[in-house]
Amino acid sequence: RAAPIARRTAQAARAAADEFDAEGWYELGLELEAVEPGEARDAYRRALELDAHHADAHVNLGRLLHEQGLVEEAERHYRLALREDPDHATAAFNLGIALEDLDQPADAIEAYRAALATDPRLADAHYNVARLYERIGKKAAALRHLSIYRRLVG
């Protein structure tokens, strides 16, 4: 039911795209994500052509690329977002996931820790870092983060 509304909104926005600034392209990307992820990626790329410093466009483009299996490219966009906004918890969290997918657990732990330094209530970051600590044999750290995770979700 929402998809046709989102499509109509996106079609109307595309018709006015010549007038868009970076934020307009970013907003169009948000509208398109649910119905046309490929077009959403294009909209985020256009936003970044107009404003290479748009951290949220980097994060969202990175997430869509990651979902497409382009993990290295996603990692690059998450890092660019963090360069623009070092306290972007979502960028740091998503970077952690990408680094896990690239089998870089130590770097993933650092990314999750950066996300938690910005937002200690990110339950999923606590869970993911607990799993990684368990994997590398740091049982006490794993238990500490698992306990925090349970407190946050329980």
Please name every model-derived segment.
Residues 20-31, 35:
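Mixed-charge (acidic/basic) macromolecular-recognition segments
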